[in-house]
Amino acid sequence: MHVKKGDKVQVITGKDKGKQGVILVAFPKENRVIVEGVNIVKKHSKPSQLNPQGGIITKEAPIHVSNVMPLDPKTGEPTRVGYKVEDGKKVRIAKKSGELLDK
């Protein structure tokens, strides 16, 4: 996957197009990510021990990884991801500026 947990990304398609957020959870096997404040859904929950009131809960749902692009650390614009080897390690770089995406 071209994005990781903690990356700042922008949604490029769908109902939340243009929104930006940080990746909270990544699911590599399903090619999906949960982005903070994006793809909010309402879930109806029955009363339980943890939530005795029950009711409607809003939370983020997973979004397909192809619908997000990482933001360039230099310009703050969405960018494609490239890879190169530095000191024997494969690192991600922003195609627009050439900046490192990995810390």
Swiss-Prot record:
Keyword Transferase assigned: no
Secretion signal span: none
InterPro entries (UniProt xref): KOW, Rib_uL2_dom2, Ribosomal_uL24, Ribosomal_uL24_CS, Ribosomal_uL24_KOW, Translation_prot_SH3-like_sf
A UniProt-annotated Pfam family: ribosomal_L24
Coiled coil residues, start to end: none
Phylogenetic placement of the source organism: Bacteria, Bacillati, Bacillota, Bacilli, Bacillales
Quaternary context: Part of the 50S ribosomal subunit.
GO MF term (any one): structural constituent of ribosome
Similarity field: Belongs to the universal ribosomal protein uL24 family.
Name by which UniProt lists this protein: Large ribosomal subunit protein uL24
A single cellular component GO annotation: ribosome
Protein transport found in the keyword field: no
Gene symbol of the encoding locus: rplX
Keywords assigned by UniProt, alphabetized: Ribonucleoprotein, Ribosomal protein, RNA-binding, rRNA-binding
Function: One of two assembly initiator proteins, it binds directly to the 5'-end of the 23S rRNA, where it nucleates assembly of the 50S subunit. One of the proteins that surrounds the polypeptide exit tunnel on the outside of the subunit.
GO biological process: translation
Entry-linked SUPFAM superfamilies: Translation proteins SH3-like domain
CDD domains the UniProt entry points to: KOW_RPL26
